[in-house]
Amino acid sequence: MTLILAAAVPKAARLASPAAATVEFTEWLTPSNPPYPHDPAYTPDGMVWYTGQRANVIGRLDPATGTFKEWTLPTPNSGPHGLTPDKDGNIWYTGNSAGLIGKLDPKTGKITEYKMPDPSARDPHTPIFDTDGMLYFTVQGGNFVGRLNPANGEIVLKQPPTANTRPYGIVRASTGHFYFDQFNSNRIGELDPKTMGIKEYLLPDASARPRRIAIDKHDIVWYGDYARGFLGRLDPKTSKVEEFASPGGANSRPYAIVVTSDDIVWYCETGIDDKNVLVRFDPATKKMQTWAIPSGGQTVRNMVIGKPNELWLAESGNGKIARATIK
């Protein structure tokens, strides 16, 4: 475990904020072989889970003790990608390389797999539950959004109106609708879970490529424009889109993104592989702050919120799980 205090990056070109802040980074090296944590998840008991994509494992970190446990998945080279817990403490994950969704029961170690009913849905990507316990997910290369009923294993797949848009990150609004990035286009999709109908919002710049996505308590959608180096804001009620240049510029590659309960947007710039940057954006002031990730990050692909003032990051290339404590 490595603990580092990091003040905001001091250069004017990298910091536009009324006052510097401090973030405390703590990092743990995962035991996977090879180590490559792709996505993190946080559970109410304080445990941090991750997909060990290249080692074909689901892992768990206990931050209080620094101890790890990993479960090897039954399908070889399944490429675990996204993951999310259910209300009973089971961990659901996408087998991105094997066209499946899996469920791990940590109490028993039992793993159940659900194959996609359509072979073209080859790469399930990001999973998310609704309040009724139904699991929704994106399928990137197959160009689907799907729903899995855990009660009977039934899977429904729906394609967006536009072909080959590569659905990526997905979030749920207070309305119950889901919003997802269409990474191979300048579109954000909206899924109505009752009808499985999909509406698309066209982003103003044709070269925009939204990758990860977040939503605030006002149902405003935030996304990182990976191709152009912008933070984007979409109001689905009006279809209005606003863009904010990322501090690192056009090649900053905004990726992992969350919105905390105080409406602050946090995201990671990944344009320089060994110099990833954590960015804080205040929508009220339109100001940004940045912090260099101590060990470089090596592409932070996703992050989640843990306890108040706490973010959890998966540093894929470093093989590390990181906690960013906001002071």
Predicted regions and their residues:
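Bacterial N-terminal signal peptides
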Residues: 1-4
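A short helix->beta-strand "capping" segment at the edge of beta-propeller domains
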Residues: 15-34
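A short beta-strand motif characteristic of beta-propeller blades
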Residues: 26-30, 69-72, 112-116, 154-160, ...
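Beta-rich, blade/repeat-based domains predominating
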Residues: 33-45, 76-88, 119-132, 162-175, ...
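Conserved beta-strand positions in repeat-built beta-propeller and related beta-rich domains
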Residues: 48-54, 91-97, 135-141, 178-184, ...
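A short loop-to-beta-strand structural motif that recurs across blades of beta-propeller domains
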Residues: 57-60, 99-103, 143-147, 187-189, ...
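Short loop/turn segments that connect beta-strands within beta-propeller blades
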Residues: 62-66, 105-109, 149-153, 192-196, ...
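Blade-level signature of beta-propeller repeat domains, shared across WD40, Kelch, NHL, RCC1
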Residues: 298-327
